[in-house]
Amino acid sequence: MSTNLLNITDLAIELPAGSDRQYAVREVNLKLAPKETLCVVGESGSGKSLTARAIMGLLPAPHVKVTEGCINFNGEDLTKVSYEHLRQIRGSEISMIFQEPMTALNPVMSIGNQIDEVFRFHIDMQGKERTQKAMKLLEDVHLPDPINIMNAYPHELSGGQRQRAMIAMALALQPQILIADEPTTALDVTTQAQILKLIRDLQVEKNTGVLFITHDFGVVAEIADRVAVMQDGCIVESGDVDQVLNNPTHPYTQALIAAVPRLQPRASRISSEKTVLTVKDVSKTFGGGRGLFGFGKSAREVKAVKNVTLSLHRGETLGIVGESGSGKSTLARCIIRLMDTDSGDIAINGENVNQLGRADMRPWRSKIQMVFQDPFASLNPRIRIGDIIAQGPVTQGVKKQEADQRARELLDVVGLDELAFDRFPHEFSGGQRQRIGIARSLALKPEILIADEPVSALDVSIQAQILELLEQIRGQMDLSMIFITHDLRVAAQVCDRLAVMRFGEVVETGVTSEIFADPQHDYTKELLAAVPGQGWSQGLTAN
């Protein structure tokens, strides 16, 4: 008799008619034992999340459905049990942590009521006992001040706190299997490290089998016992974590691992002594005013940027790293004059542009451009790609025909077909849209490029392509670049120098290789220590 908690055999999930392919998942075979962590890894569209949702019976029926295979749990095929029985299994026997807790948690119910609902649905328990158990769960996941958390609503918690609350709900009834679908993807590196440790500790304590879905090989190296690699709905390779990470046999696995940025910084380039950008004592504060028409309580004042001083030399890439809320993106928007500063100077080629009005600033716009984190949100969905790229030069007085020709040339530079010129943003993948965003930023022939988390939402292979493209463009066009990221692996491969930000302040600056080798500030040390899979980056896995 099998000792596995879960056995998936020849699973196939069919897509509705008219889709780009017939099957989302084909011939998938997986097994999960008690106390084991199985990581299912792959890029977007590989079928990872649909496989997990099939286990839970959460496929978007009737359009997407299991057509072949079985999902065996405790002797039952979950593809054949009734809906009512499956509801009993969810939460009590198999639980799931979703990628985005803000959309998975009920926004109009307090955290305490949502945990209480789990108990009320599955077991007969008095209200006082339910409250005590909910409090204990919040303590187990290391949430501060459980009483206030119980009464708080999801929007009142940070991302890490919301994820901890969801873990508490998932573990409320001590399930045999915990499915974690990209639970740390949207979290900062220190919060990610805490959540990974929490899941591991609770797993050992409660003998839980964990099915962990991710695209991050650093996370895989940190927590996995076994790994299954998915591509186009199929498992192309599986085995022990050491075997798959250190001796992959399938070309797709090899390509994915080769695309993962290493934590060892590359050698810094010798940049020009000429300073193209100087930021001196820049500050920016939000809030502090009253509500509509001056009534109501004063809004909380947030000092997003505090007395920041930086410089950027010609031809170099300066990385600005830090966690959410550190002020990185606010500083970038101040530098490019998308928002006004409270104080300080911003000089481009020695000219202070911080106090210039809109009309006086226009000639300087061509010298400094920005690549945004979410290209889909920053591209007008109603305008063709060629017009999006040509729009900047046209507003600067360039003739439309000349601007269109420049747009076609830039599409070639960023590796897109000339047919893209007449298409719309929704017709492209995420990586292609980011290439379009880069082309648009280059249309005005800038001297300085600010890239704000340009690869954070991309799969690892696409991420590697975009980073390579940015490096090629920087060299060909003699650009100076500010690269904003929270991913220290990316920073190690891209940046010549680093500025580390925390709570709006720059706490450490220096050459990238020197900061990685000998960080001086405690916060920098904390960030570096929290990067997952550091043992693997030296050729060994954590396990």
Locate each region found by the language model.
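Conserved ABC ATPase "signature" region
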Residues: 77, 129-148, 352, 401-419, ...
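A short, surface-exposed alpha-helical micro-motif characterized by mixed small hydrophobic
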Residues: 220-222, 491-493
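ABC ATPase "signature
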Residues: 235-239, 247, 506-510, 518
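Conserved ABC ATPase signature
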Residues: 152-157, 161, 424-428, 432
